[in-house]
């Protein structure tokens, strides 16, 4: 099977934003009112300013999500499985005023939630979707992933952080739920070789101890 990847957002200079400005939060001159990104966190003190135009979810809802249905339908003509990047944005999305230099002035807005995916399923039938649910997660995001029935993601490279205690990491294989897809890494990660060379000696020991212990358990 072929797994295709689509982002939640499109670019400001995309054909979609040009042909259908009514789908996005734009002013009368088609200038964004706000843009997408992520809030400040432990990795970036100023957050992430992506700059994509945000959706007018009220308009999408009133049109029965036809644009999204068309988008997903086309993707399934190309792929057997579709992974949706930044799935948490369907629960809540981060809105940053247009013109800001970083993401510190942004705030969370409510997304369409499960309603979007119910409408897609009604139109297209059940389809295989992977929900990219990495990063900042809340109970409401986890509930949306659960309610959708889509498998979430687990990334092995995240499992051996020396700051985590014991075997508590959600990314350790023995903690995986049944409904998930496991990756060694994603497009945002190092290759396995690059990752192995970049981690600390303590983290390499964690990985060796864990993987060797589980290999011995399998042999028994």
Task: Describe the function of each predicted region.
Residues 5:
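Ligand-binding beta-strand-loop-alpha-helix segment within the catalytic cores
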């Amino acid at each position: 099977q072929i797994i295709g990847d689509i982002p939640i957002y499109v670019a400001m200079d995309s054909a979609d934003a040009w042909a259908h400005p009514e789908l996005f939060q734009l002013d009368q001159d088609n200038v964004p009112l706000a843009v997408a990104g992520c809030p400040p966190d432990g990795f970036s003190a100023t957050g992430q300013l992506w700059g994509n135009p945000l959706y007018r979810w009220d308009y999408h809802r009133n049109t029965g999500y036809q644009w999204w249905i068309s988008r997903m339908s086309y993707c399934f003509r190309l792929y057997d499985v579709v992974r949706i990047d930044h799935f948490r944005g369907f629960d809540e999305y981060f809105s940053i005023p247009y013109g800001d230099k970083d993401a510190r002035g942004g705030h969370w807005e409510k997304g369409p939630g499960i309603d979007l995916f119910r409408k897609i399923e009604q139109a297209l039938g059940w389809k295989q979707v992977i929900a990219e649910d990495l990063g900042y997660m809340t109970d409401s995001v986890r509930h949306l992933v659960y309610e959708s029935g889509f498998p979430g993601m687990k990334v092995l490279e995240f499992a051996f952080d020396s700051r985590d205690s014991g075997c508590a990491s959600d990314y350790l294989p023995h903690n995986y739920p049944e409904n998930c897809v496991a990756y060694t890494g994603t497009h945002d990660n190092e290759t396995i070789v690059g990752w192995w060379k970049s981690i600390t000696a303590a983290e390499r020991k964690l990985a060796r101890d864990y993987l060797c212990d589980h290999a011995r358990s399998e042999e028994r």
